[in-house]
Amino acid sequence: MTARELVCSQRVGQGLSRRLRPLVLAVTLGVLVVTLSGCSWSDALAIGWPEGITPEAHLNRQLWIGAVVASLVVGVIVWGLIFWSTIFHRKKTTDTELPRQFGYNMPLELVLTVTPFLIISMLFYFTVIVQDKMLYLAKDPEVVIDVTAFQWNWKFGYQRVDFKDGTLTYDGVDPARKKAMVSKPEGKDSHGEELVGAVRGLNTEDRAYLNFDKVETLGTTTEIPVLVLPAGKRIEFQLNSADVVHSFWVPKFLFKRDVMPNPVANNSVNVFQVEEITKTGAFVGHCAEMCGTYHSMMNFEVRVVAPNDFKAYLQQRIDGKTNAEALQVIAQPPLAVTTHPFDTRRGQLTNSQ
């Protein structure tokens, strides 16, 4: 090796060291941050996804973490090849020929074609498994909840409760109120024939698709609706909107579903189930579809309690107690604790100052 080549080699080594030093420092700091913060690698790889409270949510989170790991592996390989080529295969002043070309290299092209296909196939396979689990509908859910969204609040009703252990059976459908929502006749034309409405033969005020129950919780301007659910039971949610498109989203479910007006007529799926809720407590819910002026304030709370407490709560509601009163009977906070109502006086207060 000549003196000039030796000097060039030393410079390349020093340049490589300078380039790798920030990368090594960043990796070291990342490891220290995760370790000292008490976070697990699972939390770090979840990148903000919360711990779920249903079996479906746990599967969805694992799928997400798997996709993140796969992306990081592919990214590291690609970045490594880019940096390797940039550092070790730069054109040197002594180069007089073109570097080796890889065009029409059949084995390499096959590898670069098959590898992405295998990665995508694996992700697709696990996605289908998790999706089937999340969308599965059992024929005999133990609790059926009617969810009605409207601008800009929620109504929750207990349509049916049938615990498999036989300790609680309840049919809460209110057919009289539902019948009252049937479309009124449009009248008759000059020939005495009944007029046909604009919406599938019905008038625009028809709300016969909505469900009504004897025990309901209605959100208001001053009170966040609290949906009380039992832990450890399969629960079905039937979603309907009274006006525009909304979206039912409980972040801890790691799942959301759009709430459509007249879902049958719109060919939309408005039902989903959770196998069980594995943790008691209070969990915030939101509307996740832009639905107008106060969309961001359209919140609710899911309050998960033990099955015996749920039975006592439902009995109190059947006996005529309000939602807050029934919650107090089972030693629960009477109002929402994860969110609060939107203060509609804020503009008035600002103008008065």
Swiss-Prot record:
UniProt cross-references to InterPro entries, sorted A to Z: CcO_II, CcO_II-like_C, Copper_CuA, Cupredoxin, Cyt_c_oxidase_su2_TM_sf
Membrane topology: Multi-pass membrane protein
GO cellular component: plasma membrane
GO molecular function: copper ion binding; cytochrome-c oxidase activity
Cofactor(s) required for function per UniProt: Cu cation; heme
Subcellular location: Cell membrane
Coarse class of the protein's main subcellular location: membrane
Bridged cysteine pairs (disulfide): none
EC number: 7.1.1.9
Positions of transmembrane segments: 63-83, 110-130
Signal sequence bounds: 1-42
Reactions the enzyme catalyzes: 4 Fe(II)-[cytochrome c] + O2 + 8 H(+)(in) = 4 Fe(III)-[cytochrome c] + 2 H2O + 4 H(+)(out)
Cofactor annotation remark: Binds a copper A center.
Keyword list, A-Z: Cell membrane, Copper, Electron transport, Membrane, Metal-binding, Respiratory chain, Signal, Translocase, Transmembrane, Transmembrane helix, Transport
Superkingdom of origin: Bacteria
UniProt-listed GO biological process terms: ATP synthesis coupled electron transport
Binding, Cu cation: 246, 287, 291, 295
Homology family: Belongs to the cytochrome c oxidase subunit 2 family.
Function of the molecule: Subunits I and II form the functional core of the enzyme complex. Electrons originating in cytochrome c are transferred via heme a and Cu(A) to the binuclear center formed by heme a3 and Cu(B).
Name this polypeptide is given: Probable cytochrome c oxidase subunit 2
Record lineage: Bacteria, Bacillati, Actinomycetota, Actinomycetes, Mycobacteriales
